[in-house]
Amino acid sequence: ILPQVHCYRADDMLSFLQLADEHGFAVRSFHHAVESYKIRDVLAEREVSVSMWADWWGFKLEAFDAIPENLALIHQAGGRAIVHSDSEIGIQRLNQEASKGWHAGRRVGIAIGEDEALRWITANPAWALGIEDETGRIAPGLRADLVV
């Protein structure tokens, strides 16, 4: 079982990690996690991926402390950043969402290669779901839909 946890705030993520330690399991990914940048080193060290929006914030109290550099800061700390969306329209344009996060990082001096940002919507989500041996990369034996 690869636990996926829905939460927004850093204190909630830390509390859940403590709960996981007490009960002997590991969290695979936090979803939404708009304050993950505050605990990025902890998340990277524990190999917890973070599935988040590029720029949704402020729509409710838990989402007020989001920043557009969140994806880039998680990546810079060595964590697994993942772009996601709750929107049926946004999910069709995750490449554009990844680009927003990539540009936000570059604006504050975080050098991220385009190939690395592409992992935010390919290899990292596959890892979070535990299907990285089947898809998420272009490699012999893996499944992929490619448009050239």
PLM region spans:
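His/Asp/Glu-enriched, well-ordered alpha-helical/loop segment
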Residues: 2, 22, 41-44, 48-148
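Polyanionic/metal-chelating signatures
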Residues: 1-27
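Active-site environment of divalent metal-dependent phosphoester hydrolases
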Residues: 10-14, 33-40, 90-92
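A general structural motif
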Residues: 5-9, 31-35, 60-67
